[in-house]
């Protein structure tokens, strides 16, 4: 994940050199997976992509995680959803000890550019993690806790365009 972000930074720097009058940097993207970040906002994991199918495989004699979620929480959560990946990683001790939260790769890019320590995820990407109530615009914390997720790990969510910080004197949103 860090290499992806470093390449994006190199491209951004190239364009900022070429177009020095740019005043603001607007980030956009899709939820292509999750990365884990530590208390300093550093990436401490690979990018677990939306193609991660581990949540739909049978684990020994147990039903697939996606079916367990459907039965216990009465919600549909596809295997590629970020929180399905996170639950799988928790249950298989795959979350790094230094990790404190997770976010999308583009949210990590924003953190990397601005030095932000805690992820801020737009509601459209938060919904792509799964376990998200689109009417209340928040994660379904009770259901996540039932599945063994520490809700303090959840990234902050915004519904509008928020300032993340600055990069080379330019506002990053």
Kindly label every feature range from the protein language model.
Residues 1-46, 71, 98-99, 145, ...:
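N-terminal glycine/serine-rich phosphate-binding loop of ATP-dependent small-molecule kinases
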Residues 55-59:
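A short, polar/charged loop-to-alpha-helix boundary motif
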Residues 70-173:
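Gly/Ser/Thr-rich active-site cleft segment
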Residues 65-69:
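FAD-binding glycine-rich core of flavoenzymes that anchor FAD
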Residues 52:
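Carbohydrate-associated surface elements
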Residues 62:
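Metal-dependent DNA phosphodiester-chemistry modules and their immediately adjacent helices/loops
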């Amino acid at each position: 994940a860090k290499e992806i972000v470093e390449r994006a930074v190199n491209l951004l720097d190239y364009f900022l050199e070429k177009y020095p009058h740019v005043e603001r940097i607007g980030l956009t993207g899709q939820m292509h997976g999750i990365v884990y970040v530590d208390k300093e906002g550093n990436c401490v994991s690979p990018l677990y992509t939306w193609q991660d199918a581990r949540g739909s495989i049978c684990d020994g004699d147990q039903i697939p995680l996606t079916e367990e979620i459907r039965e216990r929480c009465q919600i549909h959560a596809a295997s590629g959803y970020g929180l399905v990946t996170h639950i799988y990683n928790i249950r298989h001790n795959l979350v790094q000890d230094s990790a404190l939260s997770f976010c999308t790769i583009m949210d990590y890019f924003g953190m990397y550019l601005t030095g932000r320590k805690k992820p801020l995820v737009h509601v459209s990407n938060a919904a792509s993690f799964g376990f998200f109530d689109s009417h209340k615009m928040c994660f379904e914390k009770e259901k996540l806790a039932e599945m063994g997720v520490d809700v303090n790990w959840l990234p902050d969510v915004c519904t509008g365009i928020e300032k993340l910080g600055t990069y080379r004197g330019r506002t990053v949103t």
